[in-house]
Amino acid sequence: MISIIIAYATPEKQVEIPLTVEESCTLVVAVKRSGILQQFPEINLSQAIVGIHNKRTALDAGLRDDDRIEIYRPLTMDPKQARLLRAKRGKIRRMVRGEAG
């Protein structure tokens, strides 16, 4: 038997579920056994991106002791657009405070 953690986060809540599974267990089986799909019905496992220790991994991947399985949410905004928006907000803040920019 091996010990793993299933992790998922929303903007409001972070969940880590410790789980003990057989050494032959795959990632998809562990996620289903954890009960996280019942806690977060918005997770569509067939379309979800998953990883182990911050590295993208296939659903049929094998597991090792102390693995942390992470279920990632889809991006809500293009990363380039998000950075541009943050830069514009920063420029406006500097202008309001009277800083050069």
UniProtKB/Swiss-Prot annotation:
Q: What InterPro entries does the database record attribute to this sequence?
A: Mopterin_synth/thiamin_S_b (IPR016155), RnfH (IPR005346), RnfH_sf (IPR037021)
Q: Which Gene3D superfamilies match?
A: RnfH-like
Q: What species was this sequence derived from?
A: Coxiella burnetii (strain RSA 331 / Henzerling II)
Q: What is this protein called?
A: Protein RnfH
Q: Which SUPFAM superfamilies match?
A: MoaD/ThiS
Family listed: Belongs to the UPF0125 (RnfH) family.
